[in-house]
């Protein structure tokens, strides 16, 4: 993406994978930390910027652009949980080749928590800990225990969004959803208020103007990136897991947390923020995150989960 500036600091490198050509930023020195942005119409590594910029002072931080986003391959192809999970597996391989074979700490936001959880369930030896920020799949009344690998895709909706082959109005639909004012509106729903991060808003506008920017979001909007078996995946995780979320905006229904809140390897924090608390209460979030990592490092996560 020749016209797209870097989302965060550090070196940006690209590599081929089963998920296509991927882009990732790396900065800092020390134990590796993998950061995974959320999935929406305007996603990119810019969504993890506060964490990337802070932790590169003490860790080697890897912040990926998922397939269909940022500088990664944005071709017209099916975008699925399998594709996203394969991208994370590929990045883990790169991280371990560079940093050694020790298991890594990884953090993801929103829907990408499902991809990270699946990657960890499939390759548990690769991950020391998982941090899930405002994870999807915990809405009250849901039961997502369908066949392994199944999704919530609605093919009819994808066809409607894309339009017939002769017209292909999907690009126009996407452009309507990513006008500057619309992006601001949806960020406001994420934050639960008007005091959004203006730097992120500006980058979102830029990244949605890149060629192929509509393809992954159309699959997202039609349900194709949501896993129908994610409850089974979450329950299978045996490494330390920290789940955090806010209380404002569109992402506040976590009644389904009862699925895992009795498990000794899970920890929980609630922040008086929207869905991306590390933008709003950086110090408070980092303090809770650091405490979790320290506990995970000392193998102290063995008793009943705590709340903060």
What are these regions (language model features)?
Residues 236-273:
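Conserved loop-alpha-helix segment in the C-terminal half of the alpha/beta-hydrolase fold
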Residues 263-308:
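Catalytic active-site module of serine/aspartate enzymes centered on a nucleophile-bearing elbow/loop
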Residues 121, 130-169:
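Flexible "cap/lid" loop of the alpha/beta hydrolase fold
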Residues 63-107, 111, 123:
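Active-site loop/oxyanion-hole signature of alpha/beta-hydrolase fold enzymes
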Residues 168-235:
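Conserved alpha/beta-hydrolase catalytic His-Asp/Glu region
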Residues 23-71:
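Conserved HGGG/HGGXW glycine-rich cap/lid loop of the alpha/beta-hydrolase fold
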Residues 2-21:
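N-terminal cap/lid segment of alpha/beta-hydrolase-fold proteins
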Residues 113-124, 130:
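Short glycine-enriched nucleophile-adjacent loop
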């Amino acid at each position: 993406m020749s016209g797209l500036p870097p989302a965060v600091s550090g070196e940006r490198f690209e590599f081929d994978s089963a998920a296509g050509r991927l882009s990732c930023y790396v900065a800092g020195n020390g134990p590796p930390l993998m950061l995974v942005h959320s999935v929406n119409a305007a996603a990119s590594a810019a969504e993890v910027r506060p964490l990337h910029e802070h932790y590169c002072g003490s860790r080697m931080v890897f912040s990926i652009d998922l397939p269909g986003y940022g500088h990664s391959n944005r071709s017209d192809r099916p975008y699925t949980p399998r594709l996203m999970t394969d991208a994370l597996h590929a990045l883990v391989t790169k991280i371990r080749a560079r940093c050694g074979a020790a298991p890594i700490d990884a953090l993801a936001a929103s829907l990408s928590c499902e991809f990270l959880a699946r990657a960890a369930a499939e390759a548990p030896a690769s991950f020391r800990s998982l941090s899930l920020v405002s994870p999807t799949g915990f809405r009250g009344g849901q039961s997502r225990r369908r066949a392994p690998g199944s999704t919530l895709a609605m093919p009819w909706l994808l066809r409607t969004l894309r339009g017939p082959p002769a017209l292909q109005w999907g690009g126009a639909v996407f452009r309507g959803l990513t006008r500057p004012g619309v992006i601001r509106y949806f960020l406001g729903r994420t934050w639960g208020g008007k005091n959004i991060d203006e730097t992120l808003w500006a980058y979102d506008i830029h990244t949605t103007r890149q060629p192929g920017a509509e393809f992954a979001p159309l699959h997202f909007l039609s349900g194709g990136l949501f896993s129908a078996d994610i409850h089974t995946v979450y329950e299978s995780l045996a490494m330390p897991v920290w789940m955090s979320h806010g209380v404002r905006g569109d992402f506040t229904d976590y009644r389904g947390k009862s699925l895992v809140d009795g498990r000794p390897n899970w920890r929980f924090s609630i922040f008086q923020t929207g869905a991306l608390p590390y933008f709003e209460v950086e110090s408070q979030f980092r303090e809770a995150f650091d405490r979790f990592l320290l506990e995970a490092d000392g193998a102290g996560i063995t008793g009943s989960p705590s709340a903060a």
